[in-house]
Amino acid sequence: MNTNTKKLVMAALMAALTCVATMMIAIPSPLKGYINLGDCLVLTSGWLLSPVYGFLAAGLGSALADLFAGYILYAPATFLIKGLMALIACFGFRLFHKKCSNLISRIISGATAEIVMILGYFVFEGFMYGFIPSAVNIPANGVQGIAGMIIGIVLMKTIEKSKITRLC
């Protein structure tokens, strides 16, 4: 199969899986968002795909979940925030992988991406609802970020053992 076709198919698959994982378990948070498992696939998109395909898969999959779940106002911000998370995961892994093990590289890049998610939604919700009320969602986003990072790292271990080639 053509390499570009393989990358496109993998990105589409990751976008679909991200959308499903985001919607499958959705626990409403205090403001208008929700806690979900989509971050594990957002990070996996960054670690597995190229920067552009990772950004698009993570951003589109997450934004589609917001649209389908009725969080229409969140969709544009989600597209940017989750896309940036995948970019940070990809570039962070590439940078630290030269000096550290896969596990440490994924922890550093994943934690950095999750901090961007927490800050991104804090700023977005701050403009929508005020910065004091938006601070209420920081702990929920932190829990989601930690869970997403742990599950994403375990998922990547499984992918590496199955000998699926890295496309990044």
Language-model-derived ranges and their functions:
Residues M1-C168:
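Loop-helix junctions at membrane interfaces
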